[in-house]
Regions:
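Flexible, glycine/charged-enriched surface loops at secondary-structure junctions
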Residues: 30-37, 215-218, 239-245, 270, ...
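Rossmann-like NAD(P)H-binding beta-loop-alpha module
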Residues: 143-211, 218-223
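Substrate-binding/catalytic subdomain of NAD(P)-dependent oxidoreductase enzymes
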Residues: 191, 202-299, 304-306
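N-terminal glycine-/serine-/threonine-rich beta1-alpha1-beta2 phosphate-ribose binding loop
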Residues: 1-118
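Catalytic, metal-anchored helix/loop core of enzyme active sites in primary metabolism
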Residues: 176-181, 186, 204, 209-216, ...
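Conserved active-site and cofactor/substrate-binding residues in soluble primary-metabolism enzymes
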Residues: 9, 13, 17, 37, ...
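General beta-strand structural signal in soluble alpha/beta enzymes
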Residues: 94-97, 124-126, 149-153, 176-179, ...
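Rossmann-fold NAD(P)-binding glycine/threonine-rich loop
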Residues: 100-119, 126-166
Length: 363
C-alpha cells in the first residue's frame, strides 16, 4: 500500500479537522481508499511550524486547545511558521493549503500554491482567493510539473459542486448557474423574516459559528463574488475577474422588507449567478433577489447552500448541501486528495512509496 505525506499549511478549524480525520480514522480510510495518509509538516501563524518526516504524532496536538498550541518547544518545532521553507523543502507529496482568504490579491495563499506546484508537489486548497484570482495560472503550473491542483471546497465546502459539473454533466451544455452560496447571509435573511434585526441576526450567526468576527465578506457579498467567479470560470469557461462580477449585499434589507416578501409568497435570498449571453460572454452578479416560492432555491434555509445548474437537455438541476462547517470542509480536502490519487496514480493503484533519509527526519 502506498502513502501520501502531507504538509498542512494553516492549522485552524479546517486543517485541524482534517488532522482529526487522519488521526481517528486513518486505518479505516487506508483500507477503503487503498493508500495511507501521514502528516509530516504543520505551519500556523500563531503556533509556528512543526516538521517530522517520519510522521507527526497528531493526538497530543489535537488534545490541546487551539489557542494554547505552540510548536517551539517540540522536537522539530519552531516559533516561526517558515511557510516558504516548509513548502519548498520538506519532503511532502501534497501541500494542503487552508489559510485565510484574501479577496484582494489571494496572498499569502497564492504564493503558497505557487511554491508548492513549482516544487513538484500536489496542492489541494479550500482557499477561494488563489482559485478565483489565478486558477488558470496555477493549473498551468501544475501541468508543467506533473502534479495536481484541486479546490473542491472553495465553493460549497463539502458539497461537491465542481466535480458534479465536471463528471455528471457530460454531453450537456450548461448555460448558467445560480446559487445560494453563503450560509451566513442565508441564515440572517431567515431571521429577518422572523422579525429579528440585522445586527441581532448577525450576532446570532456569530454565536452559532456561521459568521466570522468581521461578517463584512458574508453580508456584503464579497464571499459569494469569489465563488461566482470560480463557478463561471470553471463551469462556463469564462475568464472573469472580480470587477466583472456585479456585487450587492443584504445590509439594506430590513425585517419589514423580508416579512412583506413572505406575505406575497416571496423569499429574499442572496443569489450568485452567472449566465452565458447570446454573444458568448458571461453575465455574472451577486445580489439579493426576492424569489417566488416555486423557485428551486427559495426553500433553501439556514446555513444550507445550493447551486442550480441550467442545462440544455435536463433543464435545471439543483444540488444542495452544507455550505460551511469545519468537518464538512475537511471532507472536501479529503475528496481532493482522493482526486489527486485517481488522476495521477489510478493506473498503478498506488500512492508514492517513501524512503526518508535519517538526517532529515526532524528539522
Amino acid at each position: 500500500m502506498g502513502r501520501y505525506d502531507l504538509a498542512l499549511i494553516g492549522f485552524g478549524g479546517v486543517n485541524r479537522a482534517l488532522a482529526e480525520l487522519i488521526s481517528q480514522r486513518g486505518d479505516r480510510l487506508a483500507e477503503e481508499l487503498g493508500f495511507a495518509l501521514r502528516v509530516v509538516a504543520i505551519t500556523d501563524l500563531r503556533a509556528g511550524s512543526l516538521v517530522d518526516t517520519h510522521g507527526i504524532d497528531l493526538a497530543p496536538l489535537l488534545a490541546a486547545e487551539p489557542g494554547e498550541l505552540a510548536f517551539a518547544g517540540l522536537p522539530g518545532g519552531s516559533a516561526e511558521p517558515r511557510n516558504e521553507w516548509v513548502i519548498r523543502e520538506v519532503p511532502a507529496d501534497i501541500v494542503v493549503e487552508a489559510t485565510f482568504t484574501n479577496p484582494a490579491d489571494g496572498e499569502p495563499a497564492l504564493s503558497h500554491a505557487r511554491w508548492a506546484l513549482a516544487a513538484g508537489k500536489h496542492v489541494c486548497t479550500t482557499n477561494k482567493g488563489p482559485v478565483a484570482l489565478a486558477c488558470r495560472e496555477l493549473k498551468q503550473l501544475a501541468a508543467e510539473h506533473g502534479v495536481g491542483f484541486e479546490f473542491e471546497g472553495s465553493v460549497l465546502s463539502g458539497t461537491p459542486i465542481l466535480r458534479t459539473a465536471e463528471r455528471m454533466f457530460g454531453g450537456l451544455e450548461i448555460t448558467g448557474v445560480q446559487g445560494i452560496m453563503n450560509g451566513t447571509s442565508n441564515y440572517v435573511l431567515g431571521r429577518l423574516e422572523e422579525g429579528v434585526g440585522l445586527r441581532a441576526a448577525i450576532a446570532e450567526a456569530q454565536e452559532l459559528g456561521y459568521a466570522e468576527a468581521d461578517p463584512t465578506a458574508d453580508i456584503e457579498g464579497h464571499d459569494v463574488q469569489l465563488k461566482v467567479m470560480i463557478l463561471a470560470n470553471e463551469v462556463l469557461g469564462a475568464e472573469l475577474c472580480r470587477e466583472d462580477v456585479i456585487r450587492e449585499g443584504i445590509s439594506k434589507i430590513t425585517p419589514e422588507d423580508a416579512q412583506d416578501a413572505v406575505s406575497k409568497g416571496l423569499r429574499w435570498k442572496l443569489v450568485g449567478s452567472a449566465a452565458r449571453r447570446p454573444d458568448g460572454t458571461v453575465d455574472a452578479r451577486v445580489a439579493p433577489v426576492a424569489l417566488p416560492g416555486h423557485h428551486p432555491l427559495a426553500g433553501i434555509s439556514g446555513p444550507v447552500n445550493a447551486v442550480a445548474f441550467h442545462t440544455d437537455l435536463l433543464g435545471t438541476v439543483t444540488v444542495s448541501g452544507p455550505g460551511a462547517g469545519r468537518i464538512e470542509t475537511a471532507y472536501a480536502l479529503l475528496s481532493d486528495i482522493i482526486a489527486i490519487h485517481q488522476r495521477h496514480h489510478a493506473d498503478d493503484d498506488t500512492a508514492p512509496a517513501h524512503r526518508v533519509p535519517q538526517e532529515t527526519s526532524r528539522v
